[in-house]
From Swiss-Prot:
It is found in: Virion membrane; Host nucleus. HAMAP family: INFV_M1. InterPro entries: Flu_matrix_M1 (IPR036039), Flu_matrix_M1_C (IPR013188), Flu_matrix_M1_N (IPR001561), Flu_matrix_M1_N_sub1 (IPR015423), Flu_matrix_M1_N_sub2 (IPR015799), INFV_M1 (IPR037533). Homodimer and homomultimer. Interacts with NEP. Binds ribonucleocapsid by both interacting with genomic RNA and NP protein. May interact with HA and NA. Cannot bind NP without genomic RNA. It comes from the Viruses. This is Matrix protein 1. One of its GO terms (biological process) is viral budding from plasma membrane. A motif (Nuclear localization signal) lies at residues 101-105. Belongs to the influenza viruses Matrix protein M1 family. Keywords: Host nucleus, Membrane, RNA-binding, Viral matrix protein, Virion. Disulfide bonds: none annotated.
Amino acid sequence: MSLLTEVETYVLSIVPSGPLKAEIAQRLEDVFAGKNTDLEALMEWLKTRPILSPLTKGILGFVFTLTVPSERGLQRRRFVQNALNGNGDPNNMDRAVKLYRKLKREITFHGAKEIALSYSAGALASCMGLIYNRMGAVTTEVAFGLVCATCEQIADSQHRSHRQMVATTNPLIRHENRMVLASTTAKAMEQMAGSSEQAAEAMEVASQARQMVQAMRAIGTHPSSSAGLKDDLLENLQTYQKRMGVQMQRFK
């Protein structure tokens, strides 16, 4: 796996699923391929994205700044600086300085990532802030190692939280989660279907599913009534894809 592929993988792991994630993935691919060289416009676009947490925006801004060639005097962005200040905690800053000194002696991506993984996400973000504000200088490879370690820490905590929700025995939470998944699957189907004539059927199925979820929420239904909703939708989607000549088996 190439270095940039690895960076893209880690960064996208902390972005919530949805149309915005697909957009960010495309931007990252363009940046890494050298197709997008307007850092100013890229940062302005990132700043105004909804849903993303300030820290995620800060990490993406850091990655864009590392990758896109820019004029020396280009102004640093406040939204990135604020996100990478370790919540203003002096302990984070102390640890960030110690980590920076270690990273300065490191030259490889994996070496930097190994060192960084033993620090908290707050200290890692502060260390990124030091580098972003030009208070410290490390090689691009080492900076990417720091980025990936930070994303791994964040993704770990997101995964723990997600696992707790999936494993919950509370029927109301499970019911709502199934309806949310069915609704987002329906949205994805509508987007994939596009405007072709054969898409009418898939669009109809997706639309009915969303109306059904709305009705279930409006009248309040038994928690078990949502079982299998998403799977039924995915089966419909796969049937539609086969007719279109697309073979994708990995949605479930």
